[in-house]
Amino acid sequence: MYEYIKGKYIDMYKDYIVIENNNIGYKIYTSGSTMAKLPSIGENIMLYTEQIVREDFIGIYGFLTKDELSMFKLLLTINGVGAKAALSLLSISNVSTLKYAIKVGDEKTITRAPGIGKKTAQRIILELKDKIEIDISEEDDEQIINKVTDDKKVLEAVAALVTLGYSEKEASKVINLCDKNNSLEQIIKEALKHLMK
Protein backbone atom coordinates (compact mmCIF):
# COMPACT_ATOMS: atom_id res chain seq x y z
CA MET A 1 0.00 0.00 0.00
CA TYR A 2 2.80 2.44 0.90
CA GLU A 3 5.96 2.56 -1.22
CA TYR A 4 7.81 4.94 1.11
CA ILE A 5 7.19 7.58 3.74
CA LYS A 6 8.88 10.96 4.13
CA GLY A 7 8.61 13.06 7.23
CA LYS A 8 10.16 14.38 10.40
CA TYR A 9 11.94 11.85 12.60
CA ILE A 10 10.23 12.33 15.98
CA ASP A 11 11.35 9.56 18.34
CA MET A 12 12.96 6.12 18.67
CA TYR A 13 11.84 3.16 20.77
CA LYS A 14 13.12 -0.40 21.18
CA ASP A 15 11.90 -1.75 17.83
CA TYR A 16 10.21 1.16 16.09
CA ILE A 17 10.51 4.85 15.34
CA VAL A 18 7.94 7.60 14.89
CA ILE A 19 7.80 9.73 11.74
CA GLU A 20 5.47 12.72 11.49
CA ASN A 21 3.89 13.51 8.14
CA ASN A 22 1.01 16.01 7.73
CA ASN A 23 0.50 16.16 11.51
CA ILE A 24 0.14 12.37 11.78
CA GLY A 25 2.69 10.33 13.72
CA TYR A 26 3.43 7.03 11.98
CA LYS A 27 4.75 4.09 14.01
CA ILE A 28 7.37 2.42 11.78
CA TYR A 29 8.93 -0.86 12.85
CA THR A 30 12.53 -1.15 11.71
CA SER A 31 15.84 -2.96 12.18
CA GLY A 32 18.77 -2.11 14.40
CA SER A 33 20.80 -1.59 11.24
CA THR A 34 18.50 1.19 10.01
CA MET A 35 18.23 2.70 13.50
CA ALA A 36 22.02 2.95 13.72
CA LYS A 37 22.14 5.04 10.55
CA LEU A 38 19.31 7.47 11.31
CA PRO A 39 20.08 11.19 11.57
CA SER A 40 19.34 13.27 14.65
CA ILE A 41 15.78 13.44 15.95
CA GLY A 42 13.96 16.37 14.36
CA GLU A 43 15.49 15.91 10.91
CA ASN A 44 13.56 14.78 7.84
CA ILE A 45 14.02 11.20 6.64
CA MET A 46 12.62 8.81 4.05
CA LEU A 47 12.03 5.10 4.62
CA TYR A 48 11.04 2.45 2.07
CA THR A 49 8.08 0.62 3.53
CA GLU A 50 6.09 -2.58 3.62
CA GLN A 51 2.69 -2.86 5.29
CA ILE A 52 1.81 -6.15 6.96
CA VAL A 53 -1.82 -6.93 7.67
CA ARG A 54 -2.87 -9.88 9.82
CA GLU A 55 -6.11 -10.73 11.55
CA ASP A 56 -4.87 -9.29 14.84
CA PHE A 57 -2.24 -6.79 13.67
CA ILE A 58 -1.51 -4.07 11.14
CA GLY A 59 2.01 -2.67 11.01
CA ILE A 60 4.28 -0.62 8.77
CA TYR A 61 7.92 -1.68 8.41
CA GLY A 62 10.45 0.78 7.05
CA PHE A 63 14.11 0.78 6.00
CA LEU A 64 16.62 3.34 4.76
CA THR A 65 17.50 1.32 1.65
CA LYS A 66 15.56 -0.65 -0.94
CA ASP A 67 18.11 -3.43 -0.51
CA GLU A 68 17.22 -3.89 3.16
CA LEU A 69 13.49 -3.78 2.36
CA SER A 70 13.96 -6.43 -0.34
CA MET A 71 15.87 -8.64 2.09
CA PHE A 72 13.11 -8.19 4.68
CA LYS A 73 10.50 -9.35 2.15
CA LEU A 74 12.67 -12.30 1.11
CA LEU A 75 13.11 -13.44 4.72
CA LEU A 76 9.33 -13.38 5.19
CA THR A 77 8.99 -16.06 2.50
CA ILE A 78 10.69 -18.56 4.82
CA ASN A 79 8.36 -20.77 6.84
CA GLY A 80 8.78 -19.91 10.52
CA VAL A 81 10.29 -16.47 9.92
CA GLY A 82 7.92 -13.66 10.79
CA ALA A 83 8.44 -9.91 10.78
CA LYS A 84 10.02 -9.90 14.25
CA ALA A 85 12.55 -12.59 13.31
CA ALA A 86 13.31 -10.84 10.00
CA LEU A 87 14.08 -7.59 11.85
CA SER A 88 16.27 -9.53 14.26
CA LEU A 89 18.24 -11.01 11.35
CA LEU A 90 18.65 -7.61 9.68
CA SER A 91 19.94 -6.22 12.97
CA ILE A 92 22.94 -8.60 13.07
CA SER A 93 25.11 -6.09 11.21
CA ASN A 94 24.11 -5.04 7.70
CA VAL A 95 22.43 -6.51 4.63
CA SER A 96 25.73 -7.45 2.98
CA THR A 97 26.87 -9.42 6.02
CA LEU A 98 23.57 -11.31 6.20
CA LYS A 99 23.57 -12.07 2.47
CA TYR A 100 27.13 -13.30 2.66
CA ALA A 101 26.38 -15.51 5.69
CA ILE A 102 23.45 -17.11 3.85
CA LYS A 103 25.42 -17.54 0.62
CA VAL A 104 28.33 -19.35 2.29
CA GLY A 105 26.19 -21.27 4.80
CA ASP A 106 27.49 -19.47 7.89
CA GLU A 107 25.02 -20.71 10.53
CA LYS A 108 27.04 -19.18 13.36
CA THR A 109 26.51 -15.63 12.11
CA ILE A 110 22.81 -16.20 11.39
CA THR A 111 22.11 -17.70 14.84
CA ARG A 112 23.56 -14.55 16.44
CA ALA A 113 20.14 -13.02 15.76
CA PRO A 114 17.93 -13.33 18.86
CA GLY A 115 15.20 -15.93 18.35
CA ILE A 116 16.94 -17.67 15.45
CA GLY A 117 17.98 -21.24 16.22
CA LYS A 118 20.10 -23.69 14.26
CA LYS A 119 17.16 -25.32 12.43
CA THR A 120 15.76 -21.96 11.32
CA ALA A 121 19.23 -20.86 10.19
CA GLN A 122 19.60 -24.05 8.15
CA ARG A 123 16.17 -23.49 6.56
CA ILE A 124 17.07 -19.89 5.66
CA ILE A 125 20.34 -21.01 4.06
CA LEU A 126 18.68 -23.87 2.16
CA GLU A 127 15.84 -21.75 0.78
CA LEU A 128 17.65 -18.48 0.07
CA LYS A 129 21.20 -19.47 -0.87
CA ASP A 130 20.43 -19.64 -4.60
CA LYS A 131 18.12 -16.60 -4.56
CA ILE A 132 20.70 -14.16 -3.24
CA GLU A 133 23.10 -12.22 -5.43
CA ILE A 134 26.16 -10.56 -3.93
CA ASP A 135 27.81 -7.56 -5.53
CA ILE A 136 31.50 -8.31 -5.06
CA SER A 137 32.34 -4.65 -5.64
CA GLU A 138 30.47 -3.55 -2.49
CA GLU A 139 32.76 -1.66 -0.14
CA ASP A 140 31.23 -2.54 3.23
CA ASP A 141 33.20 -5.78 3.19
CA GLU A 142 35.52 -5.48 6.17
CA GLN A 143 33.44 -7.90 8.26
CA ILE A 144 32.70 -10.34 5.46
CA ILE A 145 35.77 -10.81 3.33
CA ASN A 146 38.88 -11.56 5.30
CA LYS A 147 38.18 -15.18 6.17
CA VAL A 148 41.56 -16.52 7.29
CA THR A 149 42.12 -20.01 5.93
CA ASP A 150 44.80 -22.67 6.05
CA ASP A 151 43.22 -24.47 3.07
CA LYS A 152 46.02 -24.71 0.52
CA LYS A 153 43.52 -25.13 -2.34
CA VAL A 154 41.72 -21.90 -1.42
CA LEU A 155 44.98 -19.98 -1.12
CA GLU A 156 46.09 -21.27 -4.52
CA ALA A 157 42.76 -20.26 -6.06
CA VAL A 158 43.10 -16.74 -4.63
CA ALA A 159 46.66 -16.53 -5.97
CA ALA A 160 45.48 -17.66 -9.41
CA LEU A 161 42.84 -14.91 -9.55
CA VAL A 162 45.38 -12.32 -8.42
CA THR A 163 47.64 -13.30 -11.33
CA LEU A 164 44.65 -12.73 -13.63
CA GLY A 165 44.49 -9.12 -12.46
CA TYR A 166 41.93 -9.23 -9.64
CA SER A 167 42.75 -7.72 -6.25
CA GLU A 168 43.42 -10.07 -3.33
CA LYS A 169 40.42 -8.59 -1.52
CA GLU A 170 38.10 -9.23 -4.47
CA ALA A 171 39.54 -12.70 -5.07
CA SER A 172 39.20 -13.74 -1.41
CA LYS A 173 35.60 -12.63 -1.30
CA VAL A 174 34.52 -14.45 -4.44
CA ILE A 175 36.43 -17.65 -3.54
CA ASN A 176 34.45 -17.78 -0.29
CA LEU A 177 31.28 -18.05 -2.39
CA CYS A 178 32.54 -21.22 -4.09
CA ASP A 179 32.15 -24.87 -3.14
CA LYS A 180 35.45 -25.76 -1.44
CA ASN A 181 34.85 -29.49 -2.04
CA ASN A 182 35.47 -29.01 -5.76
CA SER A 183 38.86 -29.33 -7.41
CA LEU A 184 41.14 -26.29 -7.65
CA GLU A 185 40.29 -25.92 -11.33
CA GLN A 186 36.53 -26.08 -10.65
CA ILE A 187 36.82 -23.51 -7.84
CA ILE A 188 38.64 -21.09 -10.15
CA LYS A 189 36.04 -21.60 -12.91
CA GLU A 190 33.18 -20.99 -10.46
CA ALA A 191 34.92 -17.89 -9.10
CA LEU A 192 35.36 -16.48 -12.60
CA LYS A 193 31.64 -16.99 -13.28
CA HIS A 194 30.83 -14.88 -10.20
CA LEU A 195 33.32 -12.22 -11.27
CA MET A 196 31.87 -11.99 -14.77
CA LYS A 197 28.25 -11.51 -13.66
Curated annotation (Swiss-Prot):
SUPFAM superfamilies: DNA helicase RuvA subunit, C-terminal domain, Nucleic acid-binding proteins, RuvA domain 2-like. Its main location: cytoplasm. Residues 65-143 are annotated as: Domain II. Residues 149-197 are annotated as: Domain III. Keywords: Cytoplasm, DNA damage, DNA recombination, DNA repair, DNA-binding. The keyword Aminoacyl-tRNA synthetase does not apply. GO terms for cellular component: cytoplasm; Holliday junction helicase complex; Holliday junction resolvase complex. Residues 1-64 are annotated as: Domain I. The keyword Cytoplasm applies. GO terms for biological process: DNA recombination; DNA repair. InterPro entries: DNA_helicase_Holl-junc_RuvA_I, Hlx-hairpin-Hlx_DNA-bd_motif, NA-bd_OB-fold, RuvA, RuvA_2-like, RuvA_C, RuvA_C_sf. It is found in: Cytoplasm. GO terms for molecular function: ATP binding; four-way junction DNA binding; four-way junction helicase activity. Residues 144-148 are annotated as: Flexible linker. It comes from the Bacteria. Homotetramer. Forms an RuvA(8)-RuvB(12)-Holliday junction (HJ) complex. HJ DNA is sandwiched between 2 RuvA tetramers; dsDNA enters through RuvA and exits via RuvB. An RuvB hexamer assembles on each DNA strand where it exits the tetramer. Each RuvB hexamer is contacted by two RuvA subunits (via domain III) on 2 adjacent RuvB subunits; this complex drives branch migration. In the full resolvosome a probable DNA-RuvA(4)-RuvB(12)-RuvC(2) complex forms which resolves the HJ. Has three domains with a flexible linker between the domains II and III and assumes an 'L' shape. Domain III is highly mobile and contacts RuvB. Belongs to the RuvA family. The RuvA-RuvB-RuvC complex processes Holliday junction (HJ) DNA during genetic recombination and DNA repair, while the RuvA-RuvB complex plays an important role in the rescue of blocked DNA replication forks via replication fork reversal (RFR). RuvA specifically binds to HJ cruciform DNA, conferring on it an open structure. The RuvB hexamer acts as an ATP-dependent pump, pulling dsDNA into and through the RuvAB complex. HJ branch migration allows RuvC to scan DNA until it finds its consensus sequence, where it cleaves and resolves the cruciform DNA. This is Holliday junction branch migration complex subunit RuvA. It comes from Clostridium botulinum (strain Loch Maree / Type A3). The lineage of its organism: Bacteria, Bacillati, Bacillota, Clostridia, Eubacteriales. The gene is ruvA.
